[in-house]
Design a protein with these regions (language model features):
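N-terminal Sec signal peptide and the immediately downstream disordered periplasmic leader
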Residues: 2-5, 9-10, 15-78, 84-88, ...
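Face-selective signature of the C-terminal outer-membrane beta-barrel domain
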Residues: 257-273, 293-315
Length: 315
């Protein structure tokens, strides 16, 4: 027997072991999906459906991915006010905040300052990642008010074969409400600490001829923390490291969704402004002129035709 044969056997055993270990892990993750639903729900209840995993609607127990679904009822029950609050409650996600943007990582990995470029964010299937850094910030500056979210579908793992770039850690698809979910007008007003104020007015309706509409306008203003201490700037020339009244934030958002038959027209106008107290990018410390501003406008026309229960064509 050649001396190299035991080495070949060892390599072969390692390869076979890795293959079966991968199968066990995959089967375990799939089993976790089913175990999250109790036996009575599997037998008698409605098993949730998901679209994002394969780009057609299927039961979560049939989807080839690890999926979490957060509904509007859960968002209201737990008092989430931003999409970042939702992600912070999900297993495998971690979030951080640098007084300018919020960041999220997955599976213990998150590069500071990468603007969440490894997660693909969708709103009703429309790509939200911007075209400069390919990033997205799911906090107060998100394009849709959280009260207009019907559910959030979170698909873990790479999905670049379906969605292209950014879908490395996962895909987050925000499904918005429809006119039938409101059936009239809604007015919401809230206030909180740090002189924070938030308001929203929405109108939704589904008419007898099948036409459906949802219109909404919302705004948010906050003064933030009035005094923040940074030891790195503890010097008389830098106000002894104290940033005063430079942590404010405000957001304005308009959203419209019209649908008739297989056609859906949706549009967004959003602008977000944030004071930056950390003097990032070598700017002046404790200077109210240091600000971040971003805006987004998009109009999306979608035609969706369902040929069968597993074949959906969208354009």
């Amino acid at each position: 027997m050649s001396k190299r044969q035991p080495l070949y056997y060892l390599v072969a055993m390692l390869v076979i072991g890795a293959f079966f270990a991968g199968q066990v892990i995959a089967e375990t993750e799939f089993a976790d999906l089913e175990s999250s639903l109790d036996d009575e729900e599997l037998l008698f209840g409605d098993i949730p459906s998901v679209f994002s995993a394969s780009k057609y609607e299927q039961k979560v127990t049939e989807a080839p991915a690890r999926i979490s679904i957060v509904t509007a009822d859960e968002i209201q029950r737990y008092g989430h006010r931003t999409l970042m609050d939702v992600l912070n409650t999900l297993p495998g996600f971690q979030t951080s905040y640098d007084r300018n943007y919020s960041y999220t990582g997955a599976r213990g990995f998150g590069v500071p300052g990468d603007f969440n470029t490894r997660i693909l964010m969708l709103v009703d299937g429309h790509r939200i990642n911007e075209n400069i850094f390919d990033g997205v910030v799911p906090d107060r500056g998100f394009v849709v008010d959280i009260d207009l979210i019907d559910r959030v579908e979170v698909v873990r793992g790479p999905a670049s074969s379906l969605y292209g770039s950014s879908a490395f850690f996962g895909v987050i698809n925000v499904i918005t409400k429809r006119g039938r979910d409101l059936q009239g007008a809604e007015v919401s007003v809230a206030t909180g600490s740090q002189e924070s104020y938030q308001g929203r007015i929405s109108y939704g309706e589904r008419f007898d001829n099948g036409f459906e509409m949802l219109l909404s306008a919302s705004g948010y203003d906050s003064e933030g923390d009035d005094r923040l201490y940074y030891p790195e700037f503890d010097d008389p020339a830098s106000n002894n490291g104290i940033a005063e009244n430079v942590d404010d934030a405000n957001n304005r958002n308009l959203y419209a969704k019209l649908s008739y038959g297989d056609f859906t027209l949706s549009g967004v106008y959003e602008e977000y402004e944030k004071g930056v107290p950390t003097a990032s990018y070598e700017t002046l410390f404790n200077d109210s002129r240091t600000r971040t501003w971003e805006g987004r406008v998009y109009l999306d026309l979608k035609y969706q035709l369902t040929w069968s229960t597993i074949l959906v064509q969208s354009s």
